[in-house]
Amino acid sequence: MSGHSKWATIKHKKGETDAKRGKLFSKLSRAITVAAREGGTDVNMNIALANAVEKAKSESMPKDNIERAIQRGGGGADGVSYESILYEGYGPAGVAIIVDVLTDNKNRSAADIRNIFSNHGGQLAQPGAVAWVFERRGSVVVDGEKYSEDDVMAAAIDAGADDVVQDGEEFRVLTQPADFVAVREALTAAGIEFGQAELTMIPKSSVKLEENDARKTMKIIDALEDSDDVQEVYANFDIPDDILERLAG
């Protein structure tokens, strides 16, 4: 699991405030609505919508909220046009960062992202500056205490998964983006329940951080994730688990 994924998992386990959960659900709802508007409301025919819905489910977003977001997308334009933009930059100690934004005002978003980088010891970069550090992959997390590696491997690899990696008490099934839905469906058909399932950006290499730089990096990551227009933040840091636990505490 990447350092950023570990950070997100630790924060999720420790719980978030109602305000933060509300903001997260608002972002997830926006992503679902835009996906439904652009590709239709049938999750079986709209991969982007299926991914957005799976992401919402993995974050325990209520079913009614998800259905309302889909209905809004299917109801036509509501006067608001959203644009998806990727920003790239560097955090403290040279950590590569990609920020996935969904916004109705790109000038506002650009200024906000630039200020966050500047105020937290980072630097916004030109498009392409850090994108090469990451690769787009599908990721499905399975509870390793409930299922054996052989069972997960058999279902996933036969459906086109690239690999099944053990990470602590979990198995992480990795796929190419085009195979993500098929692998997810194969796991379900095999009776294997899974947690987080998403298309994500996985770093090809990582920057190892000690506590001082780790603290600075977590501050810029948290600030970016707290921005209203930011959907996802990807970073290539590698921080020891004990330090992550202390910082999350």
Task: Give short role names for the model-derived ranges.
Residues S139-G249:
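Positively charged, low-complexity, intrinsically disordered RNA-binding extensions
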Residues M1-I116, G121-A125, V130-S139, K208, ...:
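N-terminal cationic and glycine-rich segments that engage phosphates or anionic surfaces
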